[in-house]
């Protein structure tokens, strides 16, 4: 029997069409437990489409994506996902703290609807790590783009998922917080499998052990790639 001991995701012959536009063309790849996959490529090259297909949020025109836990194929995995563009309605009256806490929806609450002390401490620690604890009671419609991005990143990672999928996590983040986000990502990589899309690879590429360029097809590089290219570094 074929062994999938280290494999956690298998992308098999994926093609995605939107009408007459081919976003992904016969993409094949594998992700192993503990990998840090850094993905770059030109705008419109299919990077976000690949992530959504890997997450089973988008059905491919052809091919399939399979998940594994050890030797067993499984229906799902525990993902933390930060999309490039959030589908959160900024007009919805939800606070920063409530958004971060929504990443713990599977946690048990007491009869009053409150989280356990341990969960509450995790919410507090996550908000501090993201630098959003100072405006925890602000509704999201009042946030800057960077503040909202850090809030959503907190929601994505608070449950300590097996796989963290980050689509342009530095979007809208003020320069003062960029190094902080890099530190958070490096910390995540110590305990989770990470898949990260970014146009800025100078730091991210050094963290990663796998490097992909997606331009409708997928190119797996043998060395780090530090700049936006359509070819791997030689």
Annotate each predicted stretch with a short phrase.
Residues 40-42:
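The feature captures the beta-strand-to-loop junction immediately N-terminal to the Walker
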Residues 55:
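Helix-to-loop junction immediately C-terminal to a conserved catalytic motif
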Residues 63-79:
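Conserved ABC transporter NBD signature motif
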Residues 116-135:
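Conserved ABC ATPase "signature" region
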Residues 139-143, 147:
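Conserved ABC ATPase signature
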Residues 164-168:
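Catalytic Walker B motif of ABC-type/P-loop ATPase nucleotide-binding domains
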Residues 205-206, 213-234:
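Conserved beta-strand-loop-alpha-helix hinge in the C-terminal portion
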